[in-house]
Regions:
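Juxtamembrane/disordered regions of integral membrane proteins
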Residues: 1-138
């Protein structure tokens, strides 16, 4: 068993976070906001009193992503897998753990299927990038 590659954890989290900025910005930002009832005026106005400030939302999102990446890094350190297995583990986290958990919540909240696919695909693509970082940093 080796040590967790903390550089890969930080850079992998950063890669996932940047993908999220692109994903929920130019790629799918407009339909995502519409399905969540967020108007352009609301975005421009910023958080209302009683809502979390934007900096806190971003920080917590980054830390939650880092927690997932740290767990993946721990699994990689414990098993010392081949590169293709690292990618299978990373994509598996997104497709088989995070996506079903998200799906359960979306079903009970009666959220649109299109919104589910946008969010679930973000997890899968983001974690594939994380897997790539772990492979690159060996």
């Amino acid at each position: 068993m080796g040590d967790v590659n903390l550089l890969a954890v930080v850079l992998g989290t950063l890669a996932w976070f940047v993908i999220g900025a692109i994903w929920y910005g130019p790629l799918f930002g407009k339909p995502w906001r519409e399905m969540n009832g967020i108007t352009d005026e609301m975005v421009k106005a910023g958080p209302r009193p009683g809502q979390n400030p934007t900096w806190l939302i971003m920080l917590l999102a980054f830390l939650f992503e880092m927690l997932v990446v740290l767990m993946l890094g721990h699994n990689i350190a414990r098993t010392n897998p081949a590169p293709h297995v690292i990618m299978m583990m990373a994509v598996g986290f997104g497709a088989v753990i995070m996506t079903p958990a998200l799906g359960i919540n979306y079903l009970f909240q009666m959220r649109p299927g299109k919104l589910f696919f946008i969010d679930a695909a973000h997890f899968i693509v983001g974690l594939a990038a994380v897997g790539g970082v772990f492979i690159a940093l060996g």
